[in-house]
């Protein structure tokens, strides 16, 4: 059977603005850093893959000296790991509070896919505990148990590297032309395309202006009939999903995509995770 594979952050819920950003800022305050990322600054940091890597991007020699931080590699590695543990704890508490409900259409299309026998998965290099918490709030604990979850340090390279999607389809045992990825960012799209998957993009708060060339469908959200409707922003396969993207639309997408030439991700769309691969093999946002 086909597979429906979701990214987590920005796809299952609007976690960036209402979860990750305040968790980063709470951590900076807790460790005594004179830093508070604005929406605009965080949008720029999101072009860097990985939470510790985003924190590491602050560590210029001037910033390190001004804030009396470790200047050696090992000291910085341990410091970033500690900051990230605090940030993950703050974020997980926010998710548990229910402050981030699932995005429109997520619970609905998951039920449609489950009823049709599709395999369900999440492929995210965010911390597994964070992914599981968001997933359970988005679709319910009972349905979340039906998902295969590929997260955290299960792969060492972060998106736009396709490793997480390659692992997911291999473990699921599904042909790559029978899997649909749902992403919200150019980095995620490039990862899915690099693995040979068709990709639906549901734009989110910080990604609306990114380049989604190669996406099979770009929408404002998956949409809910009678609720928050979907708006098609790019529809190269002429799916015409209407107010909601339904499973039948994804089935037609797979049929049409398999008959089309392979789509390759455009180079240079966003910053790769090469930014700081030595800092960690354990992720997250």
What are these regions (language model features)?
Residues 13, 120-123, 181-182:
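Conserved SAM-binding loop
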Residues 59-66, 119-125, 135-138, 147:
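N-terminal-biased segments
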Residues 1, 117, 176-178:
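A general structural motif
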Residues 1-8, 12-104, 115:
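N-terminal helical cap/lid subdomain that shapes the substrate entry/recognition surface
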Residues 24, 101, 106-136, 192:
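Substrate-recognition element of Asp-dependent hydrolases with the DxDx(T/V) motif
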Residues 111, 127-285:
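Asp-based, Mg2+/Mn2+-dependent phosphohydrolase catalytic module
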